[in-house]
Regions:
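Transmembrane core module of solute transporters
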Residues: 23-74, 241-416, 528-531
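Transmembrane-helix bundle of Major Facilitator Superfamily
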Residues: 2-200, 343, 350, 371
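Hydrophobic transmembrane-helix bundles of small-molecule transporters
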Residues: 176-295, 320, 483, 487, ...
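C-terminal module of multi-pass small-molecule transporters
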Residues: 85, 89-99, 113-120, 132-155, ...
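Short, Lys/Arg-enriched, Gly/Pro-containing loop segments at transmembrane-helix junctions
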Residues: 207-211, 242, 276-282, 407, ...
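Hydrophobic residues within the alpha-helical transmembrane core of Major Facilitator Superfamily
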Residues: 37, 73, 107-108, 123, ...
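A gly/Pro-rich, aromatic-decorated transmembrane alpha-helix motif that marks the paired
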Residues: 163-178, 225, 229, 427-447
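Transmembrane-helix exit segments and adjacent C-terminal regions of multi-pass membrane proteins
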Residues: 1-34, 266-269, 276, 288, ...
Length: 531
């Protein structure tokens, strides 16, 4: 007999039940996006704090970048394993494990008294992030009904992923004013609160029976770690007198990349014959999903380059302090959140490729604006308009790419599918910093050589003031060169996205249907209980 047929005067009106459910979903979304924001911004929050960390803990110039690298290598290398753990064990369990490890590691990082203590804690933060991030995205599928509620949740998630780096710069500048240690310790109460609230607000996924694919886990993890290490090494300064980066032929750049590619090839071969694969190849063989993954490799490469080089330009050329430089990115965070909401509202009415295409055009136009920077540029007239334009474009890009990457993924695979998306974003960011860092350094070196050669031909050695001016002119030239390449990189990603996405907006509509015909836990909650 159906419970709905039993008289019960205490039953709340349907609108009250709906209101409570909406509030519950709202709190669940706050929990998920808070965890994702915490994970994403931690890659950038230390950027402004690094000089203070260097002075306090005695980092050498050669080792200081490992504060970021230790985190990104562990994060990027373990994402696939973290996503699969969520599918097999339960996404909520792995999510709680991830944020707990992240919080504990943040405490150790904030209390670190030496280089190795901090770097070990940063690697542990990456491990926690690799468990929390893919399961956070997969928990949206588990907890939100398909259609408009899920699209909106994905939009907020995408906005947090895109704006996290900018928010990290703002927080980094603010917290560093007190102490660099607060850039780590701020995560502790947030992580603990998220872990404690998760059982009350998030539904658990159905664990998927199966054995662990240990050979696949080992080859994929080592392959990704090797590639991320190689790209990160390429982006580091080899000669601090000239500012030159390591070359692509440097052993510790080239060898890890080659080894990593070889391990990933072996991983694909293993996954074809393994009954319980870490990454079922059906996830990446779908055309639309593959295009979304590829675009997520390219788009962050351009975005993270903007954060790095605009931040350097604002501080070195415009003379902004850490706090002011951080707040200079506040319009980017606001813009990407606004456009992400617009993209969410359009997702059920407009084909994703048109939304992403418009976003790519806007973001590319924003990057073009940075190519006109010079020593006479100001923030308000020469940076702010392009920051806003690029942020609006990025929001329109991230939402459809996130939606199409997870649309139609079977419930049992949504954790690892989310992990692939996060992996592409993480590796793409490392790739962008490495490739565009080379362009940036070469642009500086070429312009400096040109200026010093001209001074030598004039027969008078440049003064100290002239050399300082030459440095700013050269840095600006390198910045412009890097943004030229970033613009064309993003244009290529936009074209690939527009031509490759092959999914209609009906698949993302608010009709309550999951594209693959599966059901979510959130769908189950809306059904009548029978006895």
């Amino acid at each position: 007999m159906s419970v709905d047929s039993l008289p019960n005067q205490a039953d709340p009106p349907p609108e009250d039940t709906k209101g409570r459910r909406n509030r519950h979903l709202g709190l669940a979304l706050v929990l998920i996006t808070t965890a994702q924001l915490m994970v994403v911004l931690d890659a950038s929050i230390v950027n402004i704090a690094m000089p203070h960390i260097q002075d306090d803990l005695g980092f050498s110039d050669a080792n200081i970048t490992w504060i970021i690298t230790a985190y990104t290598i562990a994060f990027g290398g373990l994402l696939l394993l973290g996503g699969r753990m969520g599918d097999v064990i339960g996404r909520r369990k792995v999510f709680m494990f991830g944020v707990t490890v992240f919080a504990i590691a943040s405490l150790f990082a904030g209390l670190a008294q030496s280089e190795w203590e901090l770097l070990t804690a940063r690697a542990l933060q990456g491990l926690g992030a690799a468990a929390a991030s893919p399961t956070a995205l997969a928990l949206i599928t588990t907890n939100f009904p398909a259609g408009r509620p899920r699209n909106r949740a994905f939009a907020v998630y995408a906005a947090m992923s895109g704006a996290g780096a900018a928010i990290g710069l703002i927080l980094g500048g603010s917290l560093t004013e007190a102490s660099w240690r607060w850039t780590m310790l701020i995560n502790v109460p947030i992580g603990i609160a998220v872990a404690l609230a998760a059982p009350k607000l998030l539904s658990e996924s159905e664990p998927q029976p199966g054995r662990w694919d240990l050979p696949g886990a080992i080859t994929a993890t080592l392959g990704l770690v090797s590639i991320v290490y190689g790209f990160n090494h390429k982006g580091q300064v080899a000669n601090h007198d000239t500012g030159a980066l390591y070359s692509w032929t440097d052993f510790w750049t080239l060898a890890p990349i080659i080894v990593g590619v070889g391990l990933l090839v072996a991983f694909v071969v293993l996954e074809k014959v393994t009954p319980h694969a870490l990454l079922p190849l059906r996830i990446v063989t779908d055309r639309t999903r593959a295009v979304s993954f590829l675009a997520m490799l390219i788009v962050p490469a351009a975005m993270f380059a903007m954060f790095l080089y605009v931040s350097l330009f604002i501080q070195d050329v415009l003379g902004y302090g850490p706090l002011k430089a951080g707040f200079a990115f506040l319009p980017f965070s606001a813009g990407i959140m606004v456009s992400a909401q617009i993209a969410s509202n359009l997702a059920s009415r407009v084909d994703p490729r048109w939304i992403a295409g418009a976003g790519g055009v806007l973001a590319s136009f924003g990057l073009w604006g940075y190519t006109n920077l010079d020593l006479d540029s100001s923030y308000v007239t020469d940076l702010l308009p392009w920051i806003i334009i690029q942020s609006l474009g990025m929001g329109l890009l991230f939402v459809p790419l996130t939606l199409t990457a997870v649309a139609g993924v079977d419930q049992r695979d949504s954790g690892v599918g989310s992990a692939v998306l996060n992996t592409m974003q993480q590796v793409g960011g490392s790739l962008g910093i490495a490739v565009l860092g080379t362009i940036f350094a070469n642009g500086i070196a070429d312009r400096m050589a040109e200026l010093t050669s001209g001074a030598a031909q004039a027969g008078t050695p440049p003064t100290e003031e002239q050399m300082a001016l030459f440095g700013l002119v050269s840095q600006t030239a390198g910045t412009v060169d890097a943004f030229n390449v970033a613009m064309w990189l993003l244009i290529a990603g936009t074209v690939i996205t527009f031509l490759g996405l092959n999914i209609k907006h009906e698949a993302l509509s608010a009709d309550g249907q999951v594209p693959d015909g599966g059901e979510t836990d959130a769908d189950d909650e809306s059904k009548s209980v029978t006895v």
